[in-house]
Design a protein with these regions (language model features):
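Short active-site-adjacent structural elements
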Residues: 64-68, 72, 89-92
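Mid-to-C-terminal alpha-helical segments outside catalytic/metal-binding sites
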Residues: 93-114
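Structural preference for beta-strand elements that scaffold enzyme active sites
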Residues: 18-19, 53-57, 79-81
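Extended substrate/RNA-proximal surfaces in nucleic-acid metabolism proteins
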Residues: 1-51, 103-107
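A short acidic, amphipathic alpha-helical/loop segment
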Residues: 44-45, 68-73, 97
Length: 114
């Protein structure tokens, strides 16, 4: 996981105008989850995204990054956009999974304010 985050940061630092698409979608494919990244890794990743002006997509098809990673991005001041990653015209502009991720982020923020 450290290598994944380090490689992600280096890629952002080495690319002008980067945009990360369905970042962390590899994790469940190899038996891991975003939760295993931990707050420190996510904070470093999110800070790098903010510092480099990297745009991070919340991806409809893969449902990632998830709420914890999106919270880290928001806390760092990174730019976040929605993406359908659609391969079918009928799916363009439909954001059921993205909405669920953002709703979870909003709920977590409400809890933090209490």
């Amino acid at each position: 996981l450290d290598l994944l985050i380090e490689a992600s940061i280096r890629a952002m630092e080495g690319t002008r105008h980067a945009q990360l698409a369905h970042w962390f979608s590899i994790l469940p494919k190899v038996g891991l989850s975003e939760e295993q990244l931990g707050a420190g890794r996510l904070a470093a990743w999110a800070s790098a995204a903010a510092a480099t002006g990297t745009v991070v997509e919340v991806n409809e098809k893969w449902g990632c990054p998830g709420p914890v990673a999106v919270l880290a991005l928001r806390d760092a001041g990174a730019r976040i956009v929605a993406s359908t990653d659609s391969h079918d015209a009928a799916d363009v502009g439909r954001y059921d999974r993205v909405t669920a991720v953002l709703d979870a982020v909003e709920a977590a923020e409400r809890e933090e304010r209490r």
